[in-house]
A protein has these predicted regions:
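Short helices/loops that flank or line small-molecule/ion binding pockets
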Residues: 101-110, 230-240
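His/Asp/Glu-enriched short active-site or ligand-binding loop at hydrolase and phosphoryl-transfer sites
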Residues: 79, 204-229, 271
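N-linked glycosylation sites
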Residues: 18, 22, 26-28, 86, ...
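Structured C-terminal subdomain patch of bacterial secreted/periplasmic proteins
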Residues: 32, 147-155, 167, 246-341
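Basic- and aromatic-lined ligand-binding clefts that recognize polyanionic substrates
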Residues: 54-66, 162-217, 307-324
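A short, structured surface patch at a secondary-structure boundary
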Residues: 32-39, 45, 49, 53-129, ...
C-alpha cells in the first residue's frame, strides 16, 4: 500500500526583500514576506508585491482551503461549485458559461486569483485575458496525491499571507495521515473501487491515495488503470471489489456486473461526501476517515483516540491565533464518518466529474468535464 510520509520542508530562497518560491516536490515553510516571487504551473513567474486582501478562487478546492485555514473573509469571489461552504452567498459568483467569467472576476477587483489546472487547461484564453488586464494569477498543478494536497494547503497559505495557518493545517493533515497509517499498518487490505458516472480513479490520482490510505487496495490501480478513466463492466467483474466507494452526488450503478460483485452481495457500499472525496483540499482527510471507519472500525476507533489525545500542530508566530481557530473549526466540523451511508448534499459540489447540459438551439449537448483541481 502507498504511504504519505512527512513532506514538509523549507525550499524557499530569500534574497533581500525578494522572497522567491520555486514550487517543486516539497512545500515551503518560511514566514510570509513580500514581495514574493513564485513560478506557477505554467512556468509563469508571478510577483506578489504585498499581502493580498482580496482573493478570488476559480475552483472550490482553493476556496475550501481558504476556509480551512480561516481566511474565508479574504475571499471575494468563488465558483458556483463552492456554494456548499458557509458564507459563499455573500461572495461574487465568478462562474460563467463554460468556465470563469472574465467580467465577474474583474468586477471582484481581486489582488490575487487562484487558478486550478483544469480551468487553465479548459479556458486558457480567459486566463490570458485576465492576465492582460493586469490581474495577478497563480495556476496550480494537477494534484495527483495527498502529498500534493498538503503542499497546496501550505502554498495557498503562503500566497495569501496566511503562512502560519497554512503551515498548521498542512501539518495537521500530515499528522492525521501518519496516525491512520500507524493504525492500519498490520490490517488486511480488501480491494475497493471508486466509481462515479461510469468512471473510476486509477493510479496517479489523489483519490487513489485516499482509497489506499483509508485501508483498501485500489482495484482500478491494481488493474493497470491510471488517471480518471471509464471502467467497463468487464473490468468490474474481473476486479470483483469487496468495497465500492462512491460520492454522494453520483448514482449507484445498477448493472449485472456490479450486482455480481462481492461489494454488492454484502452491501459494502461506502458513500462519501462529494466535496470530501472529489476535491484535492484539506477535507479529503474526511474521505479517508469515512473509508477507514467502514472497512476497519477497530482501527478507526484507535485513530480517533489518537486524534483526540495527541497534541496537534500550532504556531508561535503572530498568526498563531488564526491557525488555532482554523484547527478548531476543522475539528468541530468533523463528525463521525457514516460508513456505508451518507447524507446527500443539496449543492452539486465540484467533483472530478460533473455533467453539464448546454442548450444550443434545439440541440442539447451533454458534456462530461474532468476538473483536476
Amino acid at each position: 500500500s502507498k504511504t504519505v510520509h512527512n513532506t514538509i520542508s523549507a525550499t524557499t530562497a530569500v534574497s533581500g526583500d525578494n522572497n522567491t518560491e520555486n514550487h517543486g516536490s516539497s512545500v515551503t515553510t518560511t514566514a510570509c514576506t513580500y514581495p514574493l516571487t513564485v513560478t506557477d504551473a505554467t512556468g509563469t513567474t508571478v510577483r506578489i508585491m504585498s499581502d493580498p486582501d482580496r482573493v478570488v478562487t476559480l475552483n472550490p478546492s482553493a476556496a475550501q482551503t481558504m476556509w480551512e485555514i480561516g481566511a474565508q473573509n479574504e475571499v471575494v469571489g468563488v465558483s458556483r461549485y463552492a456554494s456548499y461552504l458557509n458564507g459563499t452567498a455573500s461572495k461574487q459568483n465568478v462562474s460563467g458559461a463554460g468556465g470563469p467569467s472574465v467580467e465577474r472576476v474583474l468586477a471582484a477587483t481581486p489582488d490575487l486569483v487562484l487558478v486550478p489546472n483544469s480551468t487553465h487547461s479548459a479556458s486558457p484564453d480567459r486566463i490570458a485575458q485576465l492576465r492582460a488586464q493586469g490581474l495577478i494569477l497563480v495556476v496550480f498543478p494537477q494534484a495527483t496525491s495527498l502529498t500534493a494536497v498538503i503542499e497546496k494547503t501550505e502554498r495557498i497559505g503562503r500566497l495569501t499571507g496566511n503562512c502560519a495557518a497554512g503551515d498548521a493545517r498542512a501539518t495537521e493533515l500530515q499528522q492525521s495521515i501518519n496516525r491512520i497509517e500507524r493504525v492500519t499498518e498490520d490490517t488486511d487490505r480488501p480491494v475497493g473501487v471508486n466509481v462515479f458516472y461510469g468512471y473510476t480513479s486509477g493510479n496517479n490520482t489523489f483519490i487513489d491515495e485516499i482509497i489506499e490510505t483509508g485501508g483498501l487496495e485500489n482495484g482500478a490501480a491494481n488493474a493497470g488503470l491510471s488517471g480518471f478513466v471509464p471502467i467497463t463492466d468487464e473490468s468490474v467483474v474481473a476486479i470483483d471489489p469487496t468495497w465500492i466507494v462512491i460520492p454522494t452526488s453520483a448514482p449507484l450503478p445498477k448493472t449485472p456486473a456490479y450486482n455480481s460483485t462481492t461489494a454488492y452481495q454484502n452491501n459494502n457500499i461506502i458513500r462519501v461526501e462529494t466535496e470530501h472525496i472529489q476535491q484535492p483540499a484539506p477535507r479529503a482527510i474526511y474521505a479517508v476517515e469515512t473509508i477507514l471507519q467502514a472497512t476497519h472500525p477497530a482501527a478507526s476507533d484507535e485513530y480517533q483516540q489518537l486524534e483526540t489525545t495527541t497534541p496537534s500542530a500550532n504556531t508561535s508566530s503572530s498568526e498563531s491565533s488564526e491557525s488555532n481557530v482554523s484547527q478548531t473549526t476543522a475539528r468541530q466540523m468533523r463528525s463521525t464518518p457514516s460508513g456505508v451511508t451518507a447524507t446527500q448534499t443539496n449543492s452539486p459540489g465540484f467533483g472530478i466529474v460533473h455533467v453539464v447540459f448546454t442548450a444550443i438551439g434545439s440541440v442539447i449537448i451533454v458534456c462530461i468535464i474532468f476538473p483536476r483541481e
